[in-house]
Structure formats: C-alpha cells, structure tokens
From Swiss-Prot:
<protein>
    <recommendedName>
        <fullName>Phycoerythrobilin:ferredoxin oxidoreductase</fullName>
        <ecNumber>1.3.7.3</ecNumber>
    </recommendedName>
</protein>
<dbReference type="GO" id="GO:0050897">
    <property type="term" value="F:cobalt ion binding"/>
</dbReference>
<comment type="function">
    <text>Catalyzes the two-electron reduction of the C2 and C3(1) diene system of 15,16-dihydrobiliverdin.</text>
</comment>
<comment type="similarity">
    <text>Belongs to the HY2 family.</text>
</comment>
<keyword id="KW-0560">Oxidoreductase</keyword>
<dbReference type="Pfam" id="PF05996">
    <property type="entry name" value="Fe_bilin_red"/>
</dbReference>
<dbReference type="GO" id="GO:0050618">
    <property type="term" value="F:phycoerythrobilin:ferredoxin oxidoreductase activity"/>
</dbReference>
<dbReference type="InterPro" id="IPR022827">
    <property type="entry name" value="Phycoerythrobilin_Fdx_Rdtase"/>
</dbReference>
<dbReference type="GO" id="GO:0010024">
    <property type="term" value="P:phytochromobilin biosynthetic process"/>
</dbReference>
<dbReference type="InterPro" id="IPR009249">
    <property type="entry name" value="Ferredoxin-dep_bilin_Rdtase"/>
</dbReference>
Length: 258
C-alpha cells in the first residue's frame, strides 16, 4: 500500500531508514521557529519502485521532506532506502539571499562498499571574507575535533573546491560494527555541532542591503547550478525512477533556485 503524504512536513515513513535520527535532529532544531511546508508536488513527496530480478525484486522508496520560514528559502531532505543496504540522506538548508548566511549541507550515503559522509556549511561567496570569516572562525575548531577521529574521504575535485569551506567534514567509513560505531559516536555528534553552529548564525543574521542581496543571490544560483549539474546521485536515481522524473526532481526540487 502506497503511503500518502499531504505536504512536505508530513513525517517520513521509510522503515529502518539508517539516517532517521539525523533528520529528526534537524526537525527538532526547526521546532522553535514558525515554519511552513515547502511546496513539493505529490509525485516527489513519495516515490516507490522496484529493482533486481523478477524472481527477487527489491523495493526502493524515496520521500522528500521540506519547509520554509523567515530567513530560510528552502530546507529539504531527500530520503532514500533501496533494499536492505543502500540508504541516502541528502539535506540542504538554503538561506534567503538577503541574509549573509552559508548553506547547510549534509550528504550521508550507505552503499554496499561502505558509507560516504559529507558535512559542511557551504559558502555562496567563498572569496568574500565578509561572507565567510565569521562562519569559519566558529566552524574550524569543530571540524578539527571531529575530522581527526575519522578517515579522510580523499581529494576534493578541483572544480568543486570553491563550493566547500575549509571545515568540510569528509569521510569514507566501512560497513559493519566499526562503521556503525563511527556513525553513532562521531558522525552524529559532529552533525549536531554543525547544525547548532548554523542555527546560531541563523539567529544572529541581520538583513543585508539590496546590493549585497544581489551578490549573494548570484553566488547561491551558481552553487545550485553546480550541484544540479554534478549531482552524483543522478545515475542511481535514473536507474530507479527513470530519466524524466530524475531530471525534474534534481532541477525542480533539490536544486530549484534559478
């Protein structure tokens, strides 16, 4: 029976979704604010498909959570579970462009060969110290503490570096007990501290000038275009849901700022 979700703030219903506690923490952080559902068409609130052999089909479910509020244009989370192993959380909190705030980004992916962890407060204007310095001063000590406890994820592609801060938490960790312990003891508290840092910045943010807002908007659009063009989940989503649906989801829901 297909789950019916009436709006983007309705609870995610994926059974045994690995990353549920991270989204729960995000929802809790927003609970002290007046929020509204972000407009997401029903076809993207819940999507179900099957993959594998006809004799042993496996279910894949994707649900999208989202909201908006003062200072936040869009907060949204793509939640996917495919079979028993593959599990994805792609969370982006996008500020309105008349506040000098970074994006909050968390990509947590479980695949048969391990977990990929990416966590950051991502700049819209990386080379602008007025946009970055107050963020990085708060975030760098948090990053240094937690990155030292997990393996590195490897080199960042050169064309992507402008979209990450120096406090980008990036790791590849194994499946099994070791990975489970790292997620519980390191990734979750690191996520909580990054999220708290973002919300501290959010509370303190003051409205900017029209000229500054225009600069921020251009930076945000550039970031969104890059994320849409380079989305690493594109191939997986196409295999599950087809090309047309996937391209609409990426360009009109996940990275929709034009």
């Amino acid at each position: 029976m297909q789950i019916i979700r009436n709006n983007s703030q309705d609870p995610i219903s994926i059974s045994n979704w690995r990353w549920a506690c991270f989204l729960d923490e995000t929802i809790k952080a927003f609970s002290t604010f007046q929020t509204r559902p972000y407009q997401i068409d029903n076809d993207f609130l819940f999507r179900e498909s099957f993959f594998g052999s006809s004799s042993n089909p496996k279910k894949v479910i994707l649900e999208t959570w989202g909201l908006k509020m003062e200072k936040i244009r869009q907060a949204r989370c793509a939640c996917l579970q495919a079979g028993e192993i593959t599990s994805v959380m792609n969370l982006v909190i996008s500020p309105l462009n008349n506040y000098d705030l970074p994006f909050f980004g968390a990509d947590f992916v479980t695949l048969p060969n391990g977990h990929l962890i990416a966590l950051d407060l991502q700049p819209a204007l990386k080379d602008d110290i007025n946009h970055t310095q107050h963020v990085w001063n708060k975030l760098k000590p948090i990053h240094a503490h937690w990155q030292s406890k997990i393996p590195s994820g490897g080199d960042i592609p050169s064309d992507a570096r402008q979209y990450f801060s120096p406090a980008f938490l990036w790791s590849r960790i194994p499946l099994g007990e070791e990975g489970d312990n790292l997620i519980t003891q390191t990734i979750k508290p690191a996520f909580d501290e990054y999220l708290n840092c973002f919300f501290d910045l959010l509370r303190d943010a003051k409205i900017t000038s029209k000229e500054r807002s225009f600069q921020l908007l251009n930076g945000q659009k550039k970031y969104m275009r890059y994320r849409a063009e380079k989305d690493p989940a594109r191939g997986m989503l196409r295999s599950f849901f087809g090309e047309v649906w996937t391209e609409s989801y990426i360009n009109n829901i996940l990275f929709d700022l034009k």
